[in-house]
């Protein structure tokens, strides 16, 4: 259904989310970022308020794990949710509800989390993690590399229709790139990123 990465660039304190799905309009639902605070991807049976409320909880001083537990506690549909959170300190939390469609899962790395559901196989998130860890490019490019690797490994079993790349930083220009209802949204997202960088 959706595969995503949330990450922190420890040097610039930039947070970001890259995401792709076989549905439309992923950019307005899944990724949530705030400079100096953190990044959240909320997917599965997407509850947009998890992103909005989650960032507010982080801003109030909750750790990602505490924020996640608070969000899930009163949610009767929690087992249908998939949520990954990283804060500006690099602390992380992840939840993949058992009612998400297979393959479902997440991997927590040093300064990132990858997650997905309704994927071709576990290799999707494994390859995403490898691509991000081994990337030598700038932070935004590494987020995109993770998406490309996920797609190459099989991605969403339905194929991808929309993708987004969102970052926030106090010292770098914010990125908010979205591609919707496209036959190859990740490729188009890469084109948009390069176009944006050429403007800078």
Locate each region found by the language model.
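N-terminal nucleophile
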Residues: 1-200
